[in-house]
Amino acid sequence: MFLRRRRLIAATGLAAASAALPRVAIGQTDRRPSITIAVQQISNSASLEPLREQSNVGSRTFSFIFETLIMQNLMGQLEPMPGLAESWKRIDERTVELVLRKGVKFHNGDEMTADDVVFTFSRERMFGPDYDITNPKTLFTSVLVRDSVEGKKLPPEVPAVAKRSFPALEKVEAIDKYTVRFTNRTPDVTLEGRIGRLGSDIISRRAYEEAKTWMDWARAPVATGPYKVREFLVDQSLLLDAHDDYWGGQPPIKSVRLVVVPEVASRINGLLAGQFDFICDVPPDQIPGIEKNAKFEVLGSPIVNHRLTVFDSHHPTLADPRVRQAFSHAIDRQAIVDSLWSGRTRVPAGLQWEFYGPMFVENWTVPDYDPAKAKALLKAANYKGDPIPYRLLSNYYTNQVATAQVLVEMWRQAGLNVQIEMRENWQQIFEGNGQRAVRDWSNSAGFNDPISSIVAQHGPQGQQQQVGEWTNAEMNKLSDAMEIETDMTKRKAMFKRMLEICEREDPAYTVLHQNATFTAKRKDISWKASPSFAMEFRAVNFATN
């Protein structure tokens, strides 16, 4: 298992491929194509900083720009592979040592060294000046107050995300110019996974320090990925140029332009008219219409992300867990998959994925569809039909509004009076004025362990608890224990108990279905979709016919 590896992992994949890739000589005509990709959104936070933009749309955007020491194989099943580190080894239960690739260039031409890695994980860039390793609390306050950042001060969500990602990181030190060592305060079998997750992307120290303000940096970050930022227009477009000194070989595309096109119909019409080369987040019911045109095809599949309905247990009606249980039993999930997703995804085994390997809890299921049980639970809870608000965005997620309408009807049939309240952005979803009760969310796993999902998102430092929607003392105790437990059998038992609490006994959420993402493109472009939101546009995955 990746998380328990002790052996040195040899460099493969991109490194081997890059040796065979020629670089363009200065002055040689550049015949590489430029492409345009229409997306629903580029960034929710008006920034390109992974420590602030922890979102589905950010995951797609950042795959062009950033890289981690240990990467996920986007052309495989997201298994770990050497990235900016060519190899790594376990020193002990608290320590991992990594050997960096030599000759890796940042977008500004500087060579990446251990100094940049150490700075990436520093207080100045990640944890903030008040970082206390002995204090488990994060500093999360509000959500995506987009333009509130002053000077070089870190936005409050940056140290919160950093602490959530690395709750006990003691130090990162340079052993020599190309060797770094991560040391945790406590044992952590997931340390390699944390090093490879979104937010652990290596940045240029010089570029960060030279930026006049944090927002200047966050809108034009300098990293090592195959494409570099030329221009970012918030909520409009992102223009990227090929990073021709890229360590993995010359990128196959001269420039990539991502444009924000929120409406599905506009994205599809733009593709068919030749305005766009790729469009993202295509609803399944639109796939046949697109593929009637022989010039286009749609690729995609279920990904490592689940769609959820999330509860605020502080709402007077939802304070009784039986009401939240009734919500879960009133949902015919398979009907949603069959009708809105044309059977192209599935109802998963709760908030987990098979790539957890031995940590996957077999024989676990989502709550069964049982309207009679839902009605009985509501009767036992003495629910009288009071309205329950459901804050909703307009199709941030694929099929979001249609799914919400189906859910409201299913809940109505069970006796729940749920009222949709449309909101414009995530800040309005989370704001405390009025009564919060039900909202949409999706959860991914940043690496192959439950720590990266149920603990990171619903544990004591997770977003749901940090914004004050839900808490559970036993869940929090288990989360803290699982962070430091090294016995995999004990860890799995802890995870199973977390699922029982969060999905059955005191519901924090209920899983609707596994998410799926579908990308439509020109058929004369050879390209494959990955099992995640990230898009792979290195030379191994792009060619024009």
PLM segments and residue spans:
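N-terminal lobe/hinge region of extracytoplasmic solute-binding protein
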Residues: 38-92, 122, 220-223
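Gly/Pro-rich hinge or "lid" segments in bacterial periplasmic/extracellular proteins
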Residues: 73-75, 156-157, 166-167, 177-178, ...
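Aromatic- and charge-enriched surface segment that lines or borders ligand/interaction sites
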Residues: 86-141, 181, 267-270, 317-319
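Acidic-aromatic pocket-rim loops
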Residues: 130-149, 350-354, 422, 427-484, ...
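Ligand-site clamp/hinge motif
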Residues: 215-218, 244-289, 300, 417
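Extracytoplasmic/peripheral linker and loop segments enriched in polar/acidic and small residues
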Residues: 322, 337, 413, 417-428, ...
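Structural transition elements
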Residues: 346-380, 394-401
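Long beta-strand-rich cores associated with HINT superfamily self-processing modules
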Residues: 519-545
